Amino acid sequence: TRKTTPGLRYLEKEAVKIGGGMNHRIGLFDMNLLKDNHVDFAGGIPAALTRARDYCKEKGKHLRIEIETRNEDEIREALATGIPDRIMLDNFTPERTRKAVELIRGWEKENGKHIEIESSGGITLDTIRDYALCGVDFVSVGALTHSVKSLDMSFKAVKE
């Protein structure tokens, strides 16, 4: 959502839907997404997840919580809290993604809680299939909104 054109977010998101894509978020008001900066400022993944959960409870907000992870250690930290509803695998290769999916699915079996998995970062329309075949629930392709090429059109008026 941060990579949409200012003032045009809803139109760009609608265009993705019309083209067959799905939007899982419009902004931070409909799902908490804890990115690396949030994690760093909070003092780590467990602290960021705990603060997000506690804030939602305190404010009476029923928002799902997604955490961005950059490696297996961060995935393990997130899983150890039992808090996230979704784990984002940021800039993972397909091979690292497969290993991460195995780790998360194994945790699910042991703990009885389903956690959605999202691949994101550097994924293109040419590589999306490689990530989808790893068993993730969602694949984000930012190019659908931030790298769209404009259609060259013109309109001719005919005087009758």
Tell me the role of every PLM-derived stretch.
Residues T1-E66, R70-T81, R86, E95-L103, ...:
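Acidic/glycine-rich phosphate/pyrophosphate-binding loops and surrounding catalytic core
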Residues D90-N91, G121, A143:
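Short secondary-structure boundary segments
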Residues L125:
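Cys/His-rich Zn2+-binding cysteine-cluster or related metal-binding knuckle/ribbon modules and their
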